[in-house]
Structure formats: structure tokens, C-alpha cells
């Protein structure tokens, strides 16, 4: 098989596969967006945020409200000191 025929086969394959892959990726993106914005995910994100604030507060010896206000750099310095 010469190079020109191989190139044509490759281009036809790409033209056929690209719409199919685009459909799959758009479905995955749409589903992930629905899951991320669901009520269960929002509750879990809120719980994770509260646990993280409590962890930081315990680690630095501050109240959770103060721990939520510190900059990220200071938080990382406290964790590794």
C-alpha cells in the first residue's frame, strides 16, 4: 500500500471517528456537570469544606472562622512547620 492510499485511509478514519468521540465526550461532560451541581454533591462539598476548616483550625490553633480567613501560603507554611 503506498503512502497516498494510507493517507486517504487515515483521513477517512479521522472524519468518521471524530463525531463519535465528540458525542461521547460531550455526554461525559454533561453528566459530570449534572453530578457536580447535584444536591448530594453540594452537601458533600460543604461537609468537606467544614472538615478542612476544622483541620486547619486544629493544626494552627485558631477558631474555624479564623482558619477560613488565612491565606493559602500561610496555611501551607503552618502545615509543613
Curated annotation (Swiss-Prot):
GO biological process per UniProt: defense response to bacterium; defense response to fungus; hemolysis in another organism; monoatomic ion transport
A GO CC term assigned to this protein in UniProt: other organism cell membrane
Prodomain residues: 66-81
Disulphide bond pairs: none
InterPro entries, sorted: Antimicrobial_7 (IPR012526)
Annotated signal peptide: 1-22
Cellular localisation: Secreted; Target cell membrane
Distribution of this protein across tissues and organs: Expressed by the venom gland.
Keywords recorded for this protein, A-Z: Antibiotic, Antimicrobial, Cytolysis, Fungicide, Hemolysis, Ion transport, Membrane, Secreted, Signal, Target cell membrane, Target membrane, Transmembrane, Transport
Chief place where the protein resides: secreted
Role noted for this protein: At high concentrations, acts as a pore former in cellular membranes and causes the leakage of the cells. At submicromolar concentrations, degranulates granulocytes and has a weak hemolytic activity against human erythrocytes. Also strongly inhibits the production of superoxide anions. Has a strong antibacterial activity against Gram-negative bacteria but is less active against Gram-positive bacteria. Also has antifungal activity.
Family the UniProt entry places it in: Belongs to the non-disulfide-bridged peptide (NDBP) superfamily. Long chain multifunctional peptide (group 2) family.
Protein name: Antimicrobial peptide Con22
Native source species: Urodacus yaschenkoi
